[in-house]
């Protein structure tokens, strides 16, 4: 595997010779980095595994002594550390446990690793740690191990946090992009763009009328309700970096299907829509921290929608589109005026360091 990864080629593998902010933005450059460097280096080399890799998902699924576990990790570098509706501590817990939930898993354990900058006020650290504890109690997950490093003053930005999580997947639950097929319905759990706009508003000192709070929230209870109700969930994806657009492009690409969206039922709060219009942003690409998209069989869509709407975090859930066999790997939006446009991956970085 190492020899294959280091093959000499006269054509550069990457467009940029150095890491760019957009390599962490959830768009095209991030996908190229993952698929061009990390996956070839780290994918399983077990005998017989070649050509049989599962599509990438928010969590790895590991079988151990008959049990199926979900395992994931995430790193949080949000700036500022505190923002309307949340903080880096809540993000560090909810972000990782939400990734576990996207595999249908009940979160069990977390690790927490801190990179602290010299000079950080202890009161700031105390607030972040207290927030993490409260968030963990809300989810019902235990923080069981961790690590701490301190870097020189000016070599960090206050606090960076990494969390890794393990969760248990109930028997019979199979959630993966590989299960997505033409005819499936696409359901969005709530309005878009709150988190990205909330963070950017504070960071840039922007003031909007009715400025939104982040949607930072746990999705574990919502997924547990769907699983307990026996919902046939083909795929789940939380809408973090790159927003709804990035999530659906990933699913369409990995499943080899097309996805057609209707603009009209996609909920966007008025303050978010106004801020996006003013700043030239598309809400489809703005990050969320408490929203998911569910892809289910068409015949199960209405029942799934009602279950979702019974949960406070998904009260505004809506069916927003369908999976097709037209233009595999492509996401297309039908506008309220009847026009159509391709919803592609971003090539640059819209809102850096929002999680």
Regions found by a protein language model. Name each.
Residues 1-355:
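Helix-biased detector of long, well-ordered alpha-helical tracts
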């Amino acid at each position: 595997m190492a020899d294959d990864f280091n093959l000499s080629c006269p054509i550069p593998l990457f467009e940029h010779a150095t890491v760019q902010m957009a390599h962490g933005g959830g768009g095209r450059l991030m996908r190229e980095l993952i698929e061009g460097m990390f996956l070839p280096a780290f994918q399983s080399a077990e005998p017989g595994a070649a050509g049989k890799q599962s599509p990438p998902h928010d969590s790895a699924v590991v079988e151990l002594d008959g049990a199926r576990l979900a395992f994931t990790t995430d790193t949080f570098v949000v700036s500022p550390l505190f923002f309307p509706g949340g903080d880096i501590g809540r993000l560090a817990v909810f972000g990782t446990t939400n990734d576990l939930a996207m595999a249908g898993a009940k979160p069990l354990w977390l690790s927490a690793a801190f990179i602290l900058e010299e000079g950080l006020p202890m009161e700031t650290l105390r607030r972040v740690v207290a927030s993490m504890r409260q968030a963990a109690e809300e989810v019902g997950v235990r923080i069981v191990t961790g690590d701490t490093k301190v870097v020189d003053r000016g070599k960090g930005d206050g606090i960076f946090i990494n969390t890794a999580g393990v969760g248990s997947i109930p028997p019979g639950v199979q959630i993966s992009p590989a299960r997505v097929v033409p005819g499936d319905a696409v359901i969005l759990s709530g309005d878009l763009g709150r988190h990205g706009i909330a963070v950017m508003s504070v960071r840039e000192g922007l003031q909007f009328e009715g400025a939104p709070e982040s949607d930072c929230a746990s999705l574990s209870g919502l997924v547990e309700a769907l699983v307990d109700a026996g919902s046939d969930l083909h795929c789940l994806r939380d809408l973090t970096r790159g927003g709804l657009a990035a999530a659906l492009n990933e699913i369409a690409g990995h499943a080899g299907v097309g996805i057609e969206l209707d603009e009209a039922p996609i909920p966007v709060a008025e303050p978010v829509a106004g801020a996006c219009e003013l700043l030239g942003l598309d809400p489809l690409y703005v990050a969320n921290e408490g929203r998911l998209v569910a892809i289910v069989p068409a015949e199960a869509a209405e029942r799934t929608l009602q279950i979702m709407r019974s949960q406070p975090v998904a009260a505004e859930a809506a069916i927003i589109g369908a999976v097709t066999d037209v233009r595999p790997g492509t996401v297309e939006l039908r506008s309220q005026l009847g026009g159509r446009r391709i919803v592609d991956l971003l090539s640059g970085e819209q809102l850096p360091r929002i999680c």
